[in-house]
């Protein structure tokens, strides 16, 4: 499952 924290880190 994709972690939102990591997703935001890419931004």
From Swiss-Prot:
What's the stated role of this polypeptide? Tachykinins are active peptides which excite neurons, evoke behavioral responses, are potent vasodilators and secretagogues, and contract (directly or indirectly) many smooth muscles.
Cellular component aspect of the GO annotation: extracellular region
**Entries under PROSITE patterns matching the protein:** TACHYKININ
Protein name, as recorded: Ranakinin
Enumerate the InterPro entries for this protein. Answer: Tachy_Neuro_lke_CS, Tachykinin_dom
Q: Name one GO biological process term.
A: tachykinin receptor signaling pathway
Q: Which UniProt keywords apply?
A: Amidation, Neuropeptide, Secreted
Q: Where in the cell is it found?
A: Secreted
What's the family?
Belongs to the tachykinin family.
Q: Which residues carry this modification: Methionine amide?
A: 11
Q: Does the keyword Ligase apply?
A: no
Q: Which Pfam families match?
A: Tachykinin
């Amino acid at each position: 499952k994709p972690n939102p924290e990591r997703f935001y880190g890419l931004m």
